[in-house]
Amino acid sequence: MTDSQLEQDAREFVAAVTAGAPEGWTGFELTVKGGPGGPECDGWWAVPGGGPRWMRAVAGAGELLAAIAAERGWHSARLTVRGRPGGVFEFTAEPGTVLSGDTVVLDPGYVHPLPEESTPGSALPPAGDAARALAALRAFLRGRAELLGETEELAPPATPEQLAEAERRLGHRLPDDLRALYLTTDGSGGTTSLIDGRQLLTLDEMVEAAEHLRYAGKFRFAWDEPGDAVVPLGPRPHGAVRRCHDHPGWVPFTTDGSGNHHAVDLAPAAAGRPGQVLDIGADNYEGPLYVADSVTSLLVHHLDLLERGHYALQDDWPPYLLLDQDPDEEPEEPEWNDDGLPEAAGPDLQSVRITPRAPVAPLDLAPLDLAPLAAVPRLRRLDLVTRTATGLGTLRPLPVEFLRAGLDGAGLAPLAGHPHLGALDLACDTPLDLAPLRTLPALWWLDLSRCAVADLGALGELAGLRYLALTEAQWAQLLERDALPPALVAARSVGAVAAAEWAARIGHPAGESYRVEGLLAEGG
């Protein structure tokens, strides 16, 4: 492809973007990059009278990315486009790879799939009942009004047409009980808090919040901490909710004003119910919390708490009522963080991190026998930090996905064939045999920078490996052997700033960005 043809294609792409502009727009910014499912378009329109309006996918983006990358000799490309009506537009293409400090990322848009994002869902029917939900809401509002001494105004109802349009934009039909709620009140109106101390979003706010959560979810992934990024913990009841940080099937319908929401789950796991309610958002670092099997059950529960007297009246102005949400239950913590293993671990424990109470040299710490973990059937993460583990075979029947540990003389042999291990951060003093890594079907992340390794050649056979961290000397040996893992997406040279020559051998190109400028017509 010639430069003139490439420039023409870039101008046509900008014209296609602005052809879909909303009325009254005053500017836009769009970034296009490769992703696991094809090109990802992250963009927004500036529109007077409100916040940014998120931009949807643009036709032809993938083809243009590929054409520019091929013409420039890049592994991949990243596009940024900015403009305003009647003003200058800027179209910039850069290599899609990123070199930062000691790490090169060949595909910055890559997000490793979470364990249960696309597993088969529930075949169970919804648990909600529209009539019962509305009856519970009305009874709750009457009871609260009596306690507060004033009646609160609900918002006007949404029309069936407004509800249908919101569902079209969401790509989901809402559960019948939530639909009935919106056909009664589109938002909280004059109520201080309609559901569990939170405001009911309007339908327009619901769509905006859902789009924001989908956008923000792309930034949860971090190459340096796979345990947090890709091994979410599972909420109770087990098997009801997908183990994800976020999901397109989780539709927010309330807000606390600080980034936390109730959401209806329209993609439940096998033991869940369509329309079950989750607590998601900024404060749920480990993933969602299960709240109720339906909006109906949530509203009925609130009415029950009110009728049983599980509430407190706050003297602020305006006065409000605060429900005691968990008067009967203290859930077990799913994480353990201490200097030793728990003496009596419960069945809900999913993450164990062992940290010394005071700084201690690794060699001064006694090896840790993992045998007690046999009683932890849902263990997903095990982080021993600097401790050496003995009894690694204990982990064979457990669903562990992330392991950071020192290895004893048995090396990796006790882990051979483990079906779930996806991320390994290892340390050892004696030369390590990497052959057992070939038997780990889920392995995608590996840090051997704290290991002595007999032969790094086996790494070239790990077709599923996406991340590899080695020392500078280990990288030199691996590249000399021409044994780079074939599907590598990110690489780290531990203890040294990544040199351009090393990065180029990994796949990071040298080359200047490609830039086109022009004028946009008034109004697009």
Regions found by a protein language model. Give the residues of each.
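Compact, glycine/acidic-enriched structural inserts
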Residues: 278-309
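Concave beta-strand-loop units of leucine-rich repeat
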Residues: 326-341, 351-369, 378-391, 399-412, ...
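A surface-exposed partner-binding patch
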Residues: 38, 43-46, 118-257, 390, ...
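Charged interaction scaffolds used for protein-protein
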Residues: 12-13, 20, 45-49
